[in-house]
Amino acid sequence: VELLIVVAIIGILASIAVPNFMTSVHRAKQKSTMKDIVSISTVITDYVTDNESTPAQDGTYNGSTDFYKALSPFYIKVLPITDKWGNDFRVWTGESANHYGISNPTLNDFLVASFGRDNKQDSFFFRPNDPEGGSFLLTRMSDFNKDLIMWNGSWIRRPGIRSRRGC
């Protein structure tokens, strides 16, 4: 009987601890992925400053692509290729930066995105009149599946606290 009570207590503690641990692991991966997106955006901005346009890119890249070679090692020693879930980053530059509702992109425009934990692109649509519309609260594990997106160095899709309208 005592052994059953001990096993039951361990089971209860495990059922509480494991989800909290998994949330912490994914939160750390998300924050680290966001830092990598900032790094990628910063080096693209530096490249634009020197060259007056972005290096051409339309989607995923690797160490042998022209995009990667244009940025590494001159602007950054090692350009991140995958997010912390092991999924490829997506970068769209110039005219190909027309995803997520961005219209009429110029040669200097760029998007950097992680498709999140599930590696599936969201149907997110950026609305310039509602810059906070891209923030979301982390309330469930599925929220780690949401895309993380920077446009020209500014977050348009990220976890955060949405302010209350009219307050």
Model-derived segments and spans:
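N-terminal single-pass transmembrane signal-anchor helix
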Residues: V1-M22
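Aliphatic-rich helix starts adjacent to a transmembrane/signal segment
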Residues: N20-V38
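Short glycine/serine/threonine-biased micro-segments
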Residues: I9, K84, S114
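Short, surface-exposed interaction loops/tails
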Residues: S96-C167
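Extracellular/periplasmic head regions of type IV pilus-like filament subunits
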Residues: T42-T45, T49-Y100
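Short, solvent-exposed loop/turn and secondary-structure capping segments
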Residues: T33-M34, D50-S53, Q57, S123-F125
